[in-house]
Amino acid sequence: MYECIQDYLTNHKDEKNIYVNKCISIVGSPLSAGQSLSGVNKACDNLRKFGLHDVIKAVGWGYEDIGNIGEKIPINGFLKQENIEKENDQINNNNPSYYNNIKNAEVIGKFSEKLFQTMSSELKKKNFILNIGGDHGVAFSSILSMLQTYNNLKVIWIDAHGDINIPETSPSGNYHGMSLAHALGLFKKKVPYFEWSEKLLHLKPENVAIIGIRDIDKYEKIILKKCNINYYTMFDIDKKGIYNIICEALNKIDPNKNSPIHISLDIDSVDSIYAPGTGTIAKGGLNYREIHLLIKSISDTKRVVSMDIVEYNPLLDESDKAVHGDSLPIDPNATKTGKLCLELIARVLGNDIV
């Protein structure tokens, strides 16, 4: 029924990535303004503390740690829902060509521009870009920066949620639930403080596959179908298996099997049994083996050029215990979700069982 995965993936362990050097640019993106919980901005430094650099070296890669992009928090803190229109009316002077219902638009827009500039600069080095969030709002700049260099970029968006609301349909005004729609150019108006991005190349719907969704808002369902986006729910994964799903997804978005690939991994795609440290939990997610096989299968193409890992919230995480199979140099005090994040980073870099 499906093209054999071996026909798509390149399984020679010694073959190099055809697009990037064996060196990683680590970019910390501690954006938290795209959602409402504190703690997600601590993920970058937590992963460093738990052994990020040692893990990268252990799997044979070099790295350059660029540090963290600064998030400028307003004096009065982030906005509550009831104050969104007041803030954005002040920003755009009631200009009808602008949206006025995106929470913390100024903070997010300015942060996103800095992130875009940083990643664009790092791309000149031909390094693999590892973008550690932060909330999933950071993916907008990540994807757009990659697209300006790799205009045929394909995106695998791994998430419990669609993140494809537009401001007209968003029930919360939280940007992290709209970032994919924004990257796809689906917004009908301008966004305050995102003017820098208006003329940039945006992602085409046929070049993205969403995997693992199980918590979709009413209007997101309409948008997904209307835009003919490739998506795979947890029901699809249960019926077909994760192995067949990633094979099908790759063949659909990249039939010529030669394009660079960006992975945008929201850790809430994983079931909370394995990844409790995240703010928007939905029951029935990917299990431990499924997420590892998914990342490994994409990595085996030898064409992954960048990865977001987002929505890890250390303040919500749980302790973990060491087991005999733990072979990576991860701090024994690492919490459950933090440890999984590091394992998946190693996996995308080619770490294998044998």
From Swiss-Prot:
Annotated positions binding Mn(2+) 2? D159, H161, D266, D268
Q: Which GO terms describe its cellular component?
A: cytosol; nucleus
**Per UniProt, where does Mn(2+) 1 bind?**
H136, D159, D163, D266
Which SUPFAM superfamilies does this one have? Answer: Arginase/deacetylase
Provide the top EC class: hydrolase
PANTHER family cross-referenced by the UniProt entry: ARGINASE
Q: What does this protein do?
A: Catalyzes the hydrolysis of L-arginine into urea and L-ornithine, which is a precursor for polyamine biosynthesis. May play a role in parasite intra-hepatic development during the host liver stage.
Entry's family note: Belongs to the arginase family.
Tell me how this protein assembles: Homotrimer; oligomerization is dependent on Mn(2+) binding.
The record's NCBIfam families line, in alphabetical order, gives:
rocF_arginase
The protein's name is: Arginase
